[in-house]
Curated annotation (Swiss-Prot):
GO terms for cellular component: plasma membrane. May form an ATP-driven Vi polysaccharide export apparatus, in association with the VexA, VexB and VexD proteins. GO terms for biological process: polysaccharide transport. Belongs to the ABC transporter superfamily. It comes from Salmonella typhi. Keywords: ATP-binding, Cell inner membrane, Cell membrane, Membrane, Nucleotide-binding, Polysaccharide transport, Sugar transport, Transport. One of its GO terms (molecular function) is ABC-type transporter activity. The gene is vexC. It is a peripheral membrane protein. Its main location: membrane. This is Vi polysaccharide export ATP-binding protein VexC. ATP binds at residues 38-45. Coiled coil: none annotated. It comes from the Bacteria. Transmembrane segments: none annotated.
């Protein structure tokens, strides 16, 4: 099993501790594909970092091992002074993988063509994201975590990436954190909502969407009231 038990994560602010996750429980099997609806600023990135073992909770327990989960599309490991090919081969070497096969896969999936041998510092944001996605797909892990989105680029690029991910998901799990119900409908079979620092699992996507939309509606009402005034 993998996840969090009674985990709290907070950050200090001028107004005191800001609680992002509040004694939340989230446990799953390694082959499950779970979509969690979450509004911007609700703690998606904080949750991703905890589940990937990059941060430790202030309270509670992390179930699993560091390296079990990989943040899909994260590109902080890519070195801008190296070419795309050099970055791919470097990561293959670090994990003891075949450099030729690894690099060939990244070249084929990204279709960067001649740019593959250019320095990453010359890449656009989208090109760098595509390279990171390809590299992450081949790194050893037991499940992927997507924070916000899965793919970028034109339709052809997204179809290639979707097919490559589908192959990996035959043996690996997936967690998608997003505000877009359509994204998790395509890739997940269990659904939840991140609200008020806790994850609530739902019976189906319809229930999760209804709960999420109700929360957004309530937040919009609160914001409207905050800006109201008497004339």
């Amino acid at each position: 099993m993998f996840g969090l038990l009674g985990c709290t994560r907070y950050f200090e602010s001028d107004k005191g501790p800001r609680v992002v996750l509040d004694k939340t429980d989230f446990v799953m099997g390694y082959h499950e594909h779970i979509g969690i609806l979450a509004a911007p600023g609700s703690g998606k990135t904080t949750l991703t970092r905890l589940l990937c073992g990059l941060d430790a909770p202030d309270e509670g327990d992390f179930i699993g091992l560091r390296g079990d989960a990989l943040p899909l599309g994260a590109n902080s490991f890519i070195l801008p002074g190296l070419t795309g090919e050099e970055n791919a081969r470097m990561m293959a070497s670090l994990y003891g993988l075949d450099g030729d096969e690894f690099s060939h896969f990244c070249y084929q999936l990204t279709q960067l063509e001649q740019c593959y041998t250019d320095r990453v510092s010359e890449y656009s944001v989208t090109m760098k994201t595509h390279l990171a996605f390809a590299i992450n797909l081949l790194l050893p892990c037991r499940l992927y975590i997507a924070d916000g989105k899965l793919y970028t680029g034109d339709n052809a690029t997204q179809l290639r990436m979707q097919a490559a991910l589908a192959c990996q998901l035959q043996q690996k799990g997936l967690i998608v954190l997003t505000h877009n119900p359509r994204l998790i409908k395509e890739h997940c079979h269990a659904f939840g909502v991140l609200l008020h620092g806790k994850i609530t699992m739902c019976e189906d996507l319809a229930q999760a969407t209804a709960l999420f939309e109700q929360y957004q509606s309530n937040q919009a009402t609160i914001q409207t009231e905050d800006y109201s005034f008497d004339i």
